[in-house]
């Protein structure tokens, strides 16, 4: 069976030959000097953009967004406390960098809606994503049966309500194997531990779970 052009583009990005790595390195030098949100004429990864719903017609816009890597930069407090309680290290946002990039693109272009996004490149300090934006008021979008669902009022501001692909992944709504690593699962497990007075610093010296269970039986 013959393979399409998009297959070979995807294979080139997957293997990343020396020529492609040199091209990406040269592009990163230019991208660092640009603003954090830049509108593009065409997508960098055509195969990925097409797979996520992009079409080369009026109403579709591609935006490249630069996001800083790592967790939150918390200011170190001046007042005295234990280093453990400084609240400087170990604080990471619950949102993924990809979702943050989508929200920044939506704020830059408030009249457009986010369709999807994909990863492009990264260095030691930044990550670059390309976001596919759609004009929900354009006739070419409203008359397209593939994407006219985004013109409906319930999809307004969908990126800020966690309705994009990155937002659903952050909320733990993926229906597949390996959901034990989601934010919701970890929160649920931590909630059970706190109910049982386990591994919770505020309950040092508290009774063991079996003692609590015995007391509940006596009260009944």
From Swiss-Prot:
Superkingdom of the source species: Archaea
Region feature Disordered, mapped onto this chain: 197-220
GO BP term (any one): cytoplasmic translation
Matching SMART domains: Ribosomal_L15e
GO cellular component, one term: cytosolic large ribosomal subunit
Pfam families on file: Ribosomal_L15e
SUPFAM superfamilies: Ribosomal proteins S24e, L23 and L15e
Basic and acidic residues composition-biased segments: 197-207
Any GO molecular function: structural constituent of ribosome
Keyword field: Ribonucleoprotein, Ribosomal protein
PROSITE patterns documented for this protein: RIBOSOMAL_L15E
Family statement: Belongs to the eukaryotic ribosomal protein eL15 family.
NCBIfam families named in the record: PRK04243.1 (NF003269)
Protein name per the record: Large ribosomal subunit protein eL15
Species for this entry: Desulfurococcus amylolyticus (strain DSM 18924 / JCM 16383 / VKM B-2413 / 1221n) (Desulfurococcus kamchatkensis)
């Amino acid at each position: 069976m013959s393979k399409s052009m998009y297959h070979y583009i995807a294979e080139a990005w997957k293997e990343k030959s020396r020529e492609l790595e040199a091209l990406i390195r040269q592009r990163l030098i230019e991208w660092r000097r640009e603003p954090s949100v830049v509108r593009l004429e065409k997508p960098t990864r055509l195969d990925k953009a097409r797979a996520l719903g992009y079409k080369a017609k009026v109403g579709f816009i591609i935006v490249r967004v630069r996001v800083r890597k790592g967790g939150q930069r918390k200011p170190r407090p001046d007042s005295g406390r234990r280093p453990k309680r400084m609240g400087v290290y170990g604080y990471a946002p619950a949102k993924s960098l990809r979702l943050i990039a989508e929200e920044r693109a939506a704020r830059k272009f408030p009249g457009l809606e986010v369709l999807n996004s994909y990863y492009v490149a990264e260095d030691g300090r930044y990550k670059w994503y390309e976001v596919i934006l759609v004009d929900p008021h354009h006739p070419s979008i409203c008359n397209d049966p593939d994407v006219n669902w985004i013109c409906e009022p319930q999809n307004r501001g969908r990126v800020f309500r966690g309705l994009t692909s990155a937002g659903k992944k952050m909320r733990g709504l993926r229906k597949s194997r390996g959901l034990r690593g989601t934010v919701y699962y970890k929160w649920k497990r931590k909630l059970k531990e706190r109910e049982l007075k386990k591994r919770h610093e505020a309950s040092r010296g508290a009774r063991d779970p079996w003692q609590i269970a015995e007391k509940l039986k006596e009260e009944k």
